[in-house]
Swiss-Prot record:
Disulfide bond positions: C6-C11
Name of the protein described by the UniProt record: Urotensin-2
InterPro entries for this protein: Urotensin_II
Keywords associated with the record: Disulfide bond, Hormone, Secreted
Keyword set includes Disulfide bond: yes
Taxonomic lineage from the root: Eukaryota, Metazoa, Chordata, Craniata, Vertebrata
Subcellular localization(s) per the UniProt record: Secreted
Primary location recorded for the protein, binned into one broad class: secreted
A single MF term (Gene Ontology): hormone activity
Record GO biological process: blood vessel diameter maintenance; regulation of blood pressure
Pfam families given in the database record: Urotensin_II
GO CC terms, sorted: extracellular region
Originating organism: Polyodon spathula (North American paddlefish)
Entry similarity comment: Belongs to the urotensin-2 family.
Length: 12
């Protein structure tokens, strides 16, 4: 993906 948002153990 182009985004680098990580939450807990999930990166989107």
């Amino acid at each position: 993906g182009s985004t680098s948002e990580c939450f807990w153990k999930y990166c989107v």
